[in-house]
């Protein structure tokens, strides 16, 4: 689950980290009032969406009057912001963050992720702040500094100081950086985060360090023990199909192809997408129906897949372990009839009673193509999607 910038900064403030004074507002009038509360003569107004690249898309602006802040809020509230990280429809803006202006002398980067290879939290820092860190890592990896956190003792101040020296910080900045480093590490662990970024972490004109942005992603598997963070969830930022799928315990991710995929098991689902690509097709989604491929779940899965107007054919790839393939076939037939599927459906069944399942499909009289293997299924569905 992602958090908005204003929510991330709220957590930063709770851990004593330096952030700008600001208010999240949802009306133009509140934007003007926020300027009065903050004081000063310059403010930064930011559209709140779960996507980067807001500045280049016009979603971040420096304003010098309350009227300009009000106008910015009126421009974006209730509208969709399109950035390089969103699809063509963009993300809806329901909050505007109004905060004090910061004099920036230099921009740095500081972030943390869970490194699966070392099974540790790893911090990354760089002098290349304010830009796409993935681009920096690809083009100049030597500019990415790393510190691995020992789970037994946690982040240590000396690690923060070491990074600070490598970043060229000096004097009071070293201690400030170490405090931010340790605070972020505690926040990361306490809230079961999967990713945390401060981009940029800036050196102000007076030499102090300041967290100018906050990007936080929480591990979805740990949400059951983070009741406070559950209240931070903004459903308007979720893909409607993904949110609907979650209600039925279906793992769905929308993609940009035209071949719908329905599979039981995440690994098999990824393998299915790979082989579709191998044969020249483009998956329209990742969809894992899980271990219980019942008629009800298959029906909902079909509804979700076919809600994408780009889908020209559907590939169903099911491995029958405990569940018999003939029962799965009956479920698929029932779902196709109930939903009224108009596009070709290619089904590959393997496992318990697979032959009987294929026979049931063949005798259904529906537009269902029974494949003999995964390769055959991929070839058949690609042809079907092309209208051949």
Swiss-Prot record:
Catalyzed reactions per annotation: succinate + ATP + CoA = succinyl-CoA + ADP + phosphate; GTP + succinate + CoA = succinyl-CoA + GDP + phosphate
Cofactor(s) named in the record: Mg(2+)
Binding site for ATP: 46, 53-55, 99, 102, 107
EC number(s) given by UniProt: 6.2.1.5
Domain ATP-grasp, first and last residues per copy: 9-244
Molecular function GO labels: ATP binding; magnesium ion binding; succinate-CoA ligase (ADP-forming) activity; succinate-CoA ligase (GDP-forming) activity
Subunit structure of this chain's protein: Heterotetramer of two alpha and two beta subunits.
Designated name of the protein: Succinate--CoA ligase [ADP-forming] subunit beta
Origin species: Pseudomonas putida (strain W619)
